[in-house]
């Protein structure tokens, strides 16, 4: 990943973990990772739930509560992208209960992996460059401090 504004580094680290999980989800659903079959799918679903609880949930909250509002306010061209990213967050949240399923779990895991990868790529390739381009206007250093503090606190409490 390209060098990022220091305030985005915690989010980019989460993205690295998310991309690795997304790849494992798709490969698991395609039977390319052992154990295959229902056992492998259950293991991967558990891994997704663990990462969601440990990182993704607080990551989404940090973006929705800190990053997205500031960007929407100061970078009007980001509004449509942010609306799409918010829908992605909601779609991930809606899929979480489906990871308990026994029927159709392969499709759920594949689709979640696909959604997560596309979402992360859009943030890294579209949203973060906009943030960096408008860093002075949106108060990037203040946002960076708020993001860092929020994520530290949220993950300490989990």
Model-identified regions with their sequence ranges:
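Small-residue-biased structural context
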Residues: 1-158
